[in-house]
Amino acid sequence: MKKVILSLFVLMASVASIQAQSLYKTVRESAEKVVNDPKASDEEIQINQFKLTALNYLTMMVQKRGMKKDTYFFDSQAVNLTSFVTDFQVNLEKARNISPAKRTEILKIYTDASKFNPMFKDNDKEKVNCYVNDKTTMTPFCLDTDWEKAYDQATTLAKAALK
């Protein structure tokens, strides 16, 4: 009986691991699909290109620094990145309907959350702020971001700002 329970536990753990691994992969594949879709709008392409760039940066920096990160880390970052970008779009639209000043406030909340929650403390500010410094982008966020912390901060501040 103990062997059966232990076997079931191992099986459940491996299934959970496979499901968790797929979150990062799913976010990445979904973004790639939109970027490569000739029917996608410029807005959709730009937003999903940012997601790909941010995920590539994350992976590159983990490898470059020889860090050991588990699948939970990558999955959490990918899901929080997606939630961050989606909530930004929704809250920016809500703010736009209130006033130009409120729109600017929401934009600053999200941009600051990405800039002031670094994951790697990368000194190459030109690279990590390439989207922040691009005044035409729909995703003015820093690449060197801990997306879980940034999402928590931005969500809390945006909710208060939009009351």
Q: Where in the sequence are the language-model features?
A:
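Bacterial Sec-dependent N-terminal signal peptides
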Residues: 1-24
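A general secondary-structure boundary signal
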Residues: 3, 18, 39-42, 163
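Intrinsic low-complexity, intrinsically disordered segments enriched in polar/basic residues
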Residues: 3, 21, 68-69, 84
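Compositionally biased non-globular segments, especially hydrophobic aliphatic-rich helices
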Residues: 16-19, 57, 62, 157, ...
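Immediate post-signal-peptide N-terminus of mature secreted/exported proteins
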Residues: 21-68
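Charged, low-complexity interaction regions
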Residues: 36-46, 63-72, 95-100, 118-119, ...
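Short, charged, amphipathic alpha-helical segments
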Residues: 44-53, 71-75, 103-108
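Surface-exposed, polar helix/loop patches in the mature regions of secreted/periplasmic/lumenal proteins
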Residues: 74-163
